[in-house]
Amino acid sequence: MSYTITAQTRTEIGKGSSRRLRHAGKVPAVIYGAGKEAVSIEFEHRSIINIQTNDDFYNSDITIVLDGKEVKVRVQAMQRHAFKPMIEHVDFKFA
């Protein structure tokens, strides 16, 4: 199964801006690896909350549409809220 997430590049980084994103219903994330420079991104929480329940989500390539360009990634790590059904942050690795 293929998964697609639409994302935007983040201009602000840090704890305060990440908290503002989460309150706005977005998830801060980063894409890194493969000798490329790390890219900070953000996307809607609802675009990942349901698809992350599938087991193959963590083992398959995911397409991120980042500012109009398609990027193939894999989930490296995901931080979840302690008791709420919320994703706090996602680390993606270039596929």
Swiss-Prot record:
One of its GO terms (molecular function) is 5S rRNA binding. Keywords: Ribonucleoprotein, Ribosomal protein, RNA-binding, rRNA-binding. It comes from the Bacteria. Signal peptide: none annotated. Disulfide bonds: none annotated. GO terms for biological process: translation. GO terms for cellular component: cytosolic large ribosomal subunit. CDD domains: Ribosomal_L25_TL5_CTC. This is one of the proteins that binds to the 5S RNA in the ribosome where it forms part of the central protuberance. Part of the 50S ribosomal subunit; part of the 5S rRNA/L5/L18/L25 subcomplex. Contacts the 5S rRNA. Binds to the 5S rRNA independently of L5 and L18. Belongs to the bacterial ribosomal protein bL25 family. HAMAP family: Ribosomal_bL25. This is Large ribosomal subunit protein bL25. It comes from Shewanella loihica (strain ATCC BAA-1088 / PV-4).
